[in-house]
């Protein structure tokens, strides 16, 4: 049995919380490439813009590596949103106290592959 890896693009250290990006990622995982691009372009979320950039990059890599492919034959085979490092920031509170704000970062990985026998 042949294992296929596909064409991968990664964006790291994005200043958006993974919990805000994951619902957007769940909408396009497994969709065809043109359909995923159309869905993401219509969404207002910041996470949609970031996923769209990584998705277009993965599509460009696929078309560059394999010149026989076209965009219609690609689909999103894997899309993961992982936690990145956290920036700790101080938020001043009353009576000389403080709270710690965690600015969360995300790592987005998109893998596109050719549809085979679908």
Question: What does each model-found stretch correspond to?
Answer:
Residues 2-15, 23, 31-118:
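Structured, basic alpha/beta domains of bacterial-type, RNA-associated proteins
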């Amino acid at each position: 049995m042949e294992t296929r890896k596909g064409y991968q693009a990664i964006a790291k250290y994005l200043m958006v919380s993974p919990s805000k990006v994951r619902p957007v990622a769940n909408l396009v995982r497994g969709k065809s490439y043109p359909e995923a691009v159309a869905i993401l372009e219509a969404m207002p979320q910041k996470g949609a813009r970031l996923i769209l950039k990584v998705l277009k990059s993965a599509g460009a890599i696929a078309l560059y590596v394999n010149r026989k492919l076209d965009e219609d034959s690609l689909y999103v085979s894997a899309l993961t949103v992982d936690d990145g490092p956290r920036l700790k920031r101080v938020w001043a509170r009353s009576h000389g106290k403080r709270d710690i704000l965690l600015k969360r970062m995300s790592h987005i990985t998109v893998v596109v592959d050719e549809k085979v026998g679908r």
